[in-house]
């Protein structure tokens, strides 16, 4: 994701299914994209962002479940989880993930002080994001090898508007669509690699991201300790 600027849409969040009003046919024909929003739904924090370039629909379902379908074009990311995040959390996820092209399924979040966007990538489409990052080695977590990396975004959108910030990556080489992520293993590995992991957490979600691709995902998340 290039970043997220929060949009408070509490009334939409309460309904669970976020979409344009039925009477707004012109806008539906133009974008057919769920409006950007974030907030609480059925005990979980969700975030949904799109640059408007793709035909995309995000829907909050019961509990920790969400659904996304998207078409070619643009950048989008959404999912459910918690706010605030934690360095050490056991996150179980499972469901359906069917990308066509460049896409990630990841534990995803932000910290402030420093401002950092981080990804623990469990599955991806045609592009391994660690291949474009500064190589920080590997770590074994949750039964697989993850490639560690760092990138820097300059004057890019973020949770605090346009900023320059680092992105931390931990990318699983044995892809999976279900399992449990021990986030502490990854934060510890980043710290050993010299990265600052002492920031103040904002949200921490299991997100599906698409970048000029298409696909479908229906994911359920839970905190299991």
Swiss-Prot record:
Induction: By xylan.
Residue ranges constituting the GH11 domain according to the UniProt record: 32-222
Keywords: Carbohydrate metabolism, Disulfide bond, Glycosidase, Hydrolase, Polysaccharide degradation, Pyrrolidone carboxylic acid, Signal, Xylan degradation
Catalytic activity entry: Endohydrolysis of (1->4)-beta-D-xylosidic linkages in xylans
Cysteine disulfide links: 141-185
Alphabetized Gene3D superfamilies for the sequence: 2.60.120.180
EC number: 3.2.1.8
pH effect summary: Optimum pH is 6.0.
Active site positions, chain numbering: 117, 209
InterPro entries attached to this UniProt entry: ConA-like_dom_sf, GH11/12, GH11_AS_1, GH11_AS_2, GH11_dom, Glyco_hydro_11
GO MF annotation terms: endo-1,4-beta-xylanase activity
Temperature dependence: Optimum temperature is 60 degrees Celsius. Thermostable.
Ligase recorded as keyword: no
GO BP terms: xylan catabolic process
Pathways per UniProt: Glycan degradation; xylan degradation
Modified residues (Pyrrolidone carboxylic acid): 32
Keyword Disulfide bond part of the UniProt annotation: yes
PANTHER family reported for this sequence: ENDO-1,4-BETA-XYLANASE, ENDO-1,4-BETA-XYLANASE A-RELATED
Protein name (database record): Endo-1,4-beta-xylanase
Organism (species): Thermomyces lanuginosus
Gene that specifies this protein: XYNA
């Amino acid at each position: 994701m290039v970043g997220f600027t929060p949009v408070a849409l509490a009334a939409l969040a309460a309904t669970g299914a976020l979409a344009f009003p039925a009477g707004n046919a012109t806008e539906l024909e133009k974008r057919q994209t769920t409006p950007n929003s974030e907030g609480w739904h059925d005990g979980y924090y969700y975030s949904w962002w799109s640059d408007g370039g793709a035909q995309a629909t995000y829907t909050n379902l019961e509990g920790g479940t969400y659904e996304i379908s998207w078409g070619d074009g643009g950048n989008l990311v959404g999912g459910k989880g918690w706010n605030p995040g934690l360095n050490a959390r056991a996150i179980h996820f499972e469901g359906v993930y069917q990308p066509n092209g460049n896409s990630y399924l990841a534990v995803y979040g932000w910290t402030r002080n420093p401002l950092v966007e981080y990804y623990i990538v469990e599955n991806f489409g045609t592009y391994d994001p660690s291949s474009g990052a500064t190589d920080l080695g590997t770590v074994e977590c949750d039964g697989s090898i993850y490639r560690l990396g760092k990138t820097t975004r300059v004057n890019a959108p973020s949770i605090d508007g346009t900023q320059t910030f680092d992105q931390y990556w931990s990318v699983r080489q044995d892809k999976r669509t279900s399992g449990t992520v021990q986030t502490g293993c990854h934060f510890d590995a980043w710290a050993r690699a010299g990265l600052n992991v002492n920031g103040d957490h904002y949200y921490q979600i299991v997100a599906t991201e698409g970048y000029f691709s298409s696909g479908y995902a229906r994911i359920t998340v839970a905190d299991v300790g």
